[in-house]
Amino acid sequence: MDQPLRRHGARFDGRTAVVTGAASGIGAATAARLAEEGAAVVLVDLAEERGEVVAERIGEDGGRARFVTADVAVEEDWARVVAAAHSYGPVDVLVSNAFTVDVTPAHEMSLPSWQRQLDVNLTGSFLGFRAALPDLRDRRGAVVLTSSVHAHKGIPGHPAYAASKGALLSLCAQLAVEYGPEVRVNAVVPGPILTAAWDRVTPEDRERSVAETAVRRFGSPEEVAAAIAFLSADEASYITGTSLVVDGGWSVVKASA
């Protein structure tokens, strides 16, 4: 097999990474970035067809990747994910990126919808961390949780999503302290990133979101993937328990408004 084109180096040679929510968007870009830098990557998602396509594309580019259909909110599914990772080696990097969102105001949101969002967005990260923890401790690995600017700023229609993303930042701090000598745990906080989710947004709302950034454009999944790769790499060996905001200055503009 041809070696992947190393545009960004080989920081993850000999390492194994698990990326959830990897069938599209930030997760797919992160899986590709880690594989490009030498990691063997296990992609996890419920979207089997799209996930297989992403894994195949990584392989065609010379990387090592396999896809596992799994629900991050189901504890038993994590045994299969870790077993798949072990076909490459112990887990060195865990990127907990899977999410679901229901844009509905609190007074109209059903309890099952609320619970499902917390199960995927928050509990899924806890279950993944716990399943991979023996490897992560042994390998002195790194974990990156994908939060959101919704954790910091109230945006109508996102009560469960915001609650779960805010809780992820607290979980990040807790895990970093509890397992600090052995495992680094950080979070990324993306802002307006141009993924398929924006296909459902009106042109007017898209323009307003761009205008609310300091750089006056959407971010790309690849830009978030670059931040995740940095936090996962040895260059970030003295960084843990914190979050890296990747929002093009959206938070600053909001604070100044």
Predicted features and spans:
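Active-site loop immediately N-terminal to the catalytic Tyr-X3-Lys motif
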Residues: 107, 153-159, 216, 234
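Substrate-binding pocket helix/loop in short-chain dehydrogenase/reductase
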Residues: 105-106, 110-118, 198, 209
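Short C-terminal tail/terminal secondary-structure segment
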Residues: 2-8, 153, 229, 240-257
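Active-site helix of classical SDR
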Residues: 129, 164, 172
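Residue(s) in the substrate-gating loop at a strand-loop-helix junction
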Residues: 148
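C-terminal helical subdomain
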Residues: 3, 187-188, 208-239, 246-248
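Alpha-helical segment proximal to the catalytic Tyr-Lys
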Residues: 134, 176-181, 237
